[in-house]
Amino acid sequence: MTAISGASIGAVNAMLYSMNDMERMYQAWNEIDMDTVFDIDLNMLAEKRMYFSRNEMLAMFEKYIDMEKIKADFRDIYVSISRLNETQQPEQVEYRRLEDYDADTIRKILLASTALPVMYEAVEIDGKKYRDGGLLDNEPIQPLYDLGIRQFIVIGMRAGKVLNTEKWLDAQFITIYPSHDLGDLIDGTLNFTGRAKEFRQMLGEKDALRALKTKFHPDDLYIRMEPVLAQNDYNDIMMQLRVNYTYKTMENRVNSNIEKFNNIAKKYENL
């Protein structure tokens, strides 16, 4: 892989992926929760700035993303951001090559590319305001195409999407989209509960494994069976989630009862 690009949360994934440490990437996503996404800053409330804070997200960047290592090891990482006009509406997509910027500016670019309207404040970079790159280009192919790249792996979040490749007729594309719907903005994009994260991780792994035989190393028989295999994988995931939920529920009950017994024992110790 010679270059990578991303928009919105895909920009964060691009940075994590370029660290070439899958365990680190897995840990980062396990740590992100609803408090990370919906972080409330009392100072912002006092100033009547009705947005969620980005402090928790910045802390995640600091913990898991080594800006200097990425710049040294992986030069061509592009992030799309949406420039706002005077009425604060997105008017122009910009593609930023992160190697060209210092660490502080890279953080701003990542915050801008993940700044969803209504939820987060627009981010100012060089005197201009920017928001989520996905508003204008959620699959930033163009900057890599301009580098001369003609073979692409496109990973998206919309189930059943068919990529429009009319702008890049001389390029080849392998696309991987979810085999099942991930939900809308509220119950999908912004859902970082443990169960939702676990479902997306498991579905992504299953979809990627099937893609190896349907797109990277095509097997005609496997391709014909793919819809059935996808449904079987989905059923397996839902069963595993139910098992995990049952186990965690039982574990919590046992721990709660042990705590009660310990408290009772302590009372008798003092008699």
Predicted regions and their residues:
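Patatin-like phospholipase
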Residues: M1-A7, M15-L271
